[in-house]
Amino acid sequence: MNKYRFIFLLLIPLTMAFSSYSCKIAVLKYNGGGDWYANPTSLNNLIQFCQANLNMNINPIYDVVDVESSELFRYPFIHMTGHGNVVFSISESENLRQYLKAGGFLHIDDNYGMDAFIRPEMKKVFPELDFIELPFTHPIYHQSYNFENGLPKIHEHDNQPARGYGLIYEGRLVCFYSYESDLGDGWEDPNVHKDSQNIRISALKMGANIIQYAFTN
């Protein structure tokens, strides 16, 4: 067992010891000027949905964690979003790499405009890996909720279908990248985007699948 995985496994139970919740999840804070803080109500709503429908015991208050922080290793699931620029330094890239190698999971949700920036930055994290489009048969689409056609389309931008990409390290999906879907918008409070209830539920179900997959794989 490498030292990073040891730290990861050690810190999660330590965090749980001070809480009645089984775990806590976090939003990734990054540099470069992009709005890492976008969709401020989305993760709270997703957590509430998971609690109510999948009986998950996640702390309802998510944290914000810096990409270079050792605190990263406290969280089994990290969510990342934004519309624009992302920059990882060498040390930030290495920290994120070690977190993912140690068993952590990163969900990147393109909030539109992120694609051109996140791909080269994740290449710093895993130079040896490329994002691959996951087939519709992948288990992430078939956890508690079945999505026979892959990611749901929440908001329209460039007349492109929603696509789910992954980084697979030593046989494990360590990063799931939802592109042209806008899942996070669908998780927000109903009055923010005024999406239909069906659209919101579809987004929340897919988000729940992602968390469930991350927790069990």
Cite the ranges covered by each PLM segment.
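Aromatic-Pro/Gly-enriched surface loop or interdomain linker
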Residues: 18-77, 81-84, 174, 182-183, ...
